[in-house]
Each structure stands twice: as C-alpha cells, then as structure tokens.
Amino acid sequence: MSWSISSNQLNIENLLNEESLFFTGNGYIGVRGNFEEKYYDGASSIRGTYINAFHDITDINYGEKLYAFPETQQKLVNVIDAQTVQIYFGEEEERFSLFEGEVIQYERHLHMDKGFSERVIHWRSPGGKEVKLKFKRLTSFIYKELFIQEITIEPVNFFGKTKVVSTVNGDVSNFVDPSDPRVGSGHAKLLTVSDTVIEGDFVSIETKTKRSNLYAACTSTCRLNIDFQREYVKNEKSVETVLTFELTEKAIMTKINIYTDTLRHGDRPLRTGLDLCQKLSCLTFNDLKEQQKHYLDKFWLYADVEISGDQALQEGIRFNLFHLLQSAGRDRFSNIAAKGLSGEGYEGHYFWDTEIYMVPVFLMTNPELAKQLLIYRYSILDKARERAREMGHRKGALFPWRTISGGECSSYFPAGTAQYHISADIAYSYVQYYLVTKDLDFLKSYGAELLIETARLWMDTGHYHEGKFKIDAVTGPDEYTCIVNNNYYTNVMAKHNLRWAAKSVAELEKHAPDTLASLKAKLEITDEEIAEWIKAAEAMYLPYDPTLNINPQDDTFLQKQVWDFDNTPKEHYPLLLHYHPLTLYRYQVCKQADTVLAHFLLEDEQDESVIRDSYHYYEKITTHDSSLSSCVFSIMAAKIGELDKAYEYFIETARLDLDNTHGNTKDGLHMANMGGTWMAIVYGFAGLRIKESGLSLAPVIPKQWQSYRFSIQYLGRHISVSVDTKGTKVNLLNGEELTIKLYGKKHQLTKDEPLEITFNNGRVD
C-alpha cells in the first residue's frame, strides 16, 4: 500500500541522496539518514543533525556594500552527532563496514505509517565472521527532544567477543559548497564544545555557537539486553561509551539521545537534557514505536491521499506529506526551512515557500499546526517593522526574504529583499487561515495587526499615476526577471492585502470592538487611513495586454527578446548556474510560475480567457528551474481542462526528490515542492478553492487513475472527497451540516446524505 520507501541495494553513488530521503525528524530535531558505522575513508557524506531555528550568526562579505545591505546572516547549525555506533567482532576486532567483507543481504526502509527507519543486513567479515544486523531509528513526535536507536546483532557463524562503541561527538561542522549558491559557503565550523559530562550511565556534551550565544546539548545513554561491561573514553570534544560482551545469542542495544537548546530550554540545556534523559531512559523502542504509530494514525486520518492506478505516485505523495510533517516547526521560534530538517541547503532559512506552498497542506488537514507556523511570522513582526524603516518606509512591515530569527539574510537584493511580495504572501496565508477556521481569537491576537502593518507597507511603497496605484522596483516570484515596475503577481497580492486589512478592521468592529479600539490606539490607525487602503486596492494597476489577451509579468516584460531555448544545451540548466543574472534579466525567460501563480491564488481577478491565454504564453518560456513551479502549472493546467498536461507536471512534482530530478536532493529535500504535490491533487485535480463565499470543489480525474481520495478539515468539519471514473462523492464525516459549492452549484452537505455527482464520459453534465 506504499507506506514505505525502500532501497534494496547498496549504491555508493546514491548514498548522499539517501541521507536526505531517509532522514527522520519531528519538527524540532532532524537527523539525516547517515549510517551509524559511517562509510569508508574519503567517502562523501553530509553527516548532520539539526535543531529547528538553532543558528549562528555569520558576516556577509561584500566587495561593495551599500546602505541597508544586511551585514550578517543567520545559519542553521549542524549540532552534536549522536548517530555514531561502531561494532567490532572477535579478538582481532574486525570492524563492521558495508564496504568491507561481503554484504549477503541489504535492505533499507522508511516506514511512513509507523514513523521509523531501519536497515536490515546480513554480513560476512573479511575474516569470515557472519552476523545479521538490524539498525532502527526513530525521532519521536511525542517527546520532541528524543532520538532513539535500536541495534540488533544476531550471530550466524560467529560467537565470541563483541565490542560496541557509541559516540557522542561535539566536533562537528557544516557542509559548504562555494560553487553552488543554493548551498552555504564558508563558515563551516560554528560550534565549540563548552562541557562534557559523565554522570552514572549518561554522557552529555554541551556546545556553544560562536556569535549567537546559543547553547545546544545532547545527553545519551546505552543499554543492552544481555550481560555486558561498560567503560567510557572521554575526549575534549567527544565521549565514547564502550560496551563489551560475549555474542552468544541475539543482542539488542538501545541508545537514547536527548537534544536540548537555549531557545526552548533556558540557560541550562545540559542539565535539562540530562534530567529528561534519566526520566525517559526506561522507554523501549517498542514503547516509542507504539506511541509514534498512534500519532501518525491521527495525522494520516486527515492528511492521507489515496491514489488507485499508479503505485509510484502513491508512494510519492505519502513520502512528501510525511517529510513535511517531520520538518514543520511547532513553536514560535521555528517554521519550515526550504529543505526542512533534512539538510543544509539554503542554510536552513525560511522563505515565502512556507505560506504559499506548505501552510495550505496543514491548513486543510491540521489547522492547529498551520496556526503555529503563522504565529512564527507574528513573532518576528517587530523585526519586519525595523526592516521597513531601514528600507526607508515610514510605516509598515517588510518581512525578510530569507531568515531564521527575523533578520534579513539575503545578500543579493535583486532576487532577495526586492521580493516585497513575501509580505503579501504572509498576509494571504493569514486570510486563508481565517476563512478556513473563523478563528476570531487568532484575528484578534495576531491576524489583524499583521494585515494592517503589511498593508501599510504597500501604501508607502506604491504611488498613484494617471489614476492607478502602481508599485515600482520590485521582484516577483520569477528570479530570472528582477527589479521591475508593476509585477502583476506583486500588485494583485498587494491589492488582496490592502482589501483584507480593511476587512479585518470591519471583522473586529463587528465581533470584538474592544480589541479594535486597543489596536487602533496601539497602531495609531485612523478611519482616513483605512479608507486609503480601500481606495488603493480599487485603483491597483494590473498589467494587461489586449493583443495577446494576457497579463504581462510586468511593465517591460513583453518588450524583451524571448530566450533562445532551442539552442540552449540541456546541461546549461538550471540557467542560474551557467549565465550571469543580467543576461537572464534581458530576456523573456521565467525560472518559475509568476503570473500563473497569481492566477491560481487570486483567480477571480481575471476572466477565464485571460487565465488560459496567459498559461499558454508563460508555459513556453518557463524553465521550471525552481522546484516551486511544476505544481502550479499542474494546478492551472487542470483548471483550464488540459488534464494530460496537468498529469505530466504532477508526475514531476510527486517524485522530484525520490528520483532526484533536480540533481541536488543530497543538500536536502524540496519542501515547497512537497506541499505542491498535495496542492496539485487537491487544488488541481479536485479544484478545491477557499474564498469568502465558502468552500468549492470541481473534481476531475486523470485517465491514468481508477480513483483518488482525500479528506480536509474546514470550519470544524471533517470532509472526505472520493473521485473515480464514474463520478464524485463528498462525505461529511464529522461536524454540523454546511453549504458547499460542487461544480459551481450550491449543495447542502449533511452526515446523512453524501453528495454524489455522476460523470458523463468523464465530465459533469
């Protein structure tokens, strides 16, 4: 049923990718799928364990630095390594390694319904000693600090002295690749070991970042199910626990690791972690596996998408949803990085990806988790205000293009700070959350203030010209076209932001007048200012070309030459690695969906013919060099009725990391694309939309499938949607009846009467 991904052969060329694919995490910590015993000398590996939002500060070096360029950036830190376990057999101490001796059997699995990974191995040493080994690991969703390993050693023809060396190592570095702008360069060594402690059966290491003054600690303890001797080897930066025993029967070693840091655990993370490890050390792997299964049963009840007709795509969608869950921050300090907790690509920064591509998944399947992701943005609102002032704005909030703790980390402003649309993207996500939940407390505590401050940014950025409100010198989502006037995406999202700032005031006036009075006083809001938001939204200039019947990406986009795609070698993609930015800026060539994305998010701003013609125009000139693109084109192809094309794009998005189609899975998984896979099904094939008027659906089914099914949460209801070649069925599984739109017509949905619509030759009459 595609609940696992597996690797059944040891492929040296794919080990780096598998480190990302088989990572385990829980939103707080992420552990790459490295081998406990490591590889061979000289082998490439990105050995990593990460704590969400745990970062250091590094300088940004410029050849020429101008006003308001960020001076420093935050960088996700590779923290203490507790994965390592070496095993030695016999008096001569033959070390277990998959790269020596003979591998008789090798299997590797990530169980997405149970929440753990394992390796199953049958190995013969160079000296002929034969054993079976099983390595299991689990990062707990119940105890966020806990990462547990279980190693089973079963004798086949060898019985005798065995030594297991478990290491906790604070001498770790970050991965760097100066040749790839998508990976960090320089600043590899970010941690220093501040303390090593052995207390009873527990070993601890505490480390400190160089400049952010954050501490991270790891406490570890090991136990065996048979008699053994224990000793310790304490070094300056690591501690080894050495377990020696006679292997006469199956031996099972359990290693419990607890991670803590100053952001969540105060100024004594080592002591806190040690106490917690002592408290949890009685837990077995099976105990935690059972708890993990219970947690995931609830997650999959709401989040699972079932596809009948394509096993590979079924595997892909579950894989993507599971890794999104493993990477989603659950506190005010954290969010979802571009690579989640699976790797160091983009240095662990949070982008607009979260709000536009990832929040929708949780919004419709786990609204409480979506809420936590949005609260993170509110927690850095003051820093966004500071950034706006730094950028010359008298009012408003400008959110950083890439960040961890709230400061701008982008050193290349044309494709960074200039992407002002991120503030409107966050506002859009806040509005979607409110429409799906009607959470008035959220609007009172977070939503209205953020919507108002982002609206103020547009009023100070834009200006009126010939009766239209225009926004100059910005960059839209397409990073091959920078610093333009009136980017369609930016303008239409700003329009939405301005409208909803005014609507949020109206909502509070109606439902929470006391809160509104306090907010008006705090932010010094006047009725005249609110009226200006409405006026600017109504006057917003949205570029339109009547000859082509499309929305131009910006004021000058159509004046440029079209890129010579026919004579661009395949090996020159992605273009950003082979052409100077100015070269790209001079042509009509898109890295990713821009105007097409705007037509998805705010489809009511244009009629169907403009959306269709724009899709066809931009499809010809979009490279999809960004992993954020294919899912959007899939959604919009489905909308305009081009199902075969929608399916082609969906295939690309569903297995992008599993098949490493972008060639950089080793640096971490593409989290936005993972959210996009779900969106391509639910927003694309099923046609789901959330608007002020309510929830609407218009499902279609690709000819390659027999059926598909998913469920959503909406206004406290649990709704399932099933689609097959015969038609569509919508069930209300829990909650009060409500009105929804199905294929453009209003229907009352009740528990007793599912809505069923029959297809006629694959279409609705």
From Swiss-Prot:
It holds the Pfam family Glyco_hydro_65N. It comes from the Bacteria. GO terms for molecular function: alpha,alpha-trehalose phosphorylase activity; carbohydrate binding; hydrolase activity, hydrolyzing O-glycosyl compounds. The keyword Transferase applies. Homodimer. Belongs to the glycosyl hydrolase 65 family. Catalyzes the reversible phosphorolytic cleavage of trehalose. Phosphorolysis is specific for trehalose. This is Alpha,alpha-trehalose phosphorylase. The gene is treP.
